Each structure stands twice: as structure tokens, then as C-alpha cells.
């Protein structure tokens, strides 16, 4: 019985740690878009390398 409780606690800690490490902050919907940010067009060479 003690081992089952310990296993549950370890599993919860492991899951929370995994989610905490991999959690990325989501962009705020209220944030104003950056007027200085420009989307650079991808060159055909970059597209070819991404496509494989």
C-alpha cells in the first residue's frame, strides 16, 4: 500500500516537472503587434533544405 502511494506521488511530481520544463509562455492576445517586426521571405534554397 505504501509503495502504491509513493508511486502515485512520484508519477505526479514527474508529470509536473515534465510539464514545467516544456511549458512555453503563450503570447498574450492583448499584446500589440510589433510594428518593426517584418516577416522575411524564405529563399528557395531555404525552402528546399526544409523540404528535404
From Swiss-Prot:
Superkingdom in the source lineage: Eukaryota
Keywords: Amidation, Repeat, Secreted, Signal, Toxin
Coiled coil feature spans: none
Signal peptide start and end residues: 1-23
AXPX repeat feature ranges: 23-26, 31-34, 39-42
Positions of the pro-segment in this chain: 24-41
Tissue: Expressed by the venom gland.
UniProt keyword Signal, yes or no: yes
Subcellular location(s) of the protein: Secreted
Statement: the UniProt record of this protein carries the keyword NAD: no
GO molecular function term, any single one: toxin activity
One term under GO cellular component: extracellular region
In-chain residues carrying the UniProt-annotated modification Alanine amide: 51
Major location category of this protein: secreted
Miscellaneous field: Not found in venom, suggesting that it is a minor component. Negative results: has no activity against fungi (B.cinerea and C.albicans) and bacteria (E.coli and S.aureus). Has no hemolytic activity against human erythrocytes. Does not show cytolytic activity against insect cell lines. Does not induce feeding disorder in lepidopteran larvae after peptide injection in the vicinity of the head and thorax.
Name of the protein: Venom peptide 4a
Organism: Eumenes pomiformis
Amino acid at each position: 500500500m505504501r509503495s502504491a502511494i509513493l508511486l502515485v506521488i512520484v508519477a505526479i511530481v514527474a508529470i509536473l516537472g515534465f510539464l514545467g520544463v516544456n511549458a512555453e509562455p503563450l503570447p498574450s492576445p492583448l499584446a500589440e503587434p510589433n510594428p518593426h517586426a517584418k516577416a522575411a521571405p524564405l529563399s528557395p534554397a531555404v525552402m528546399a533544405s526544409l523540404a528535404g
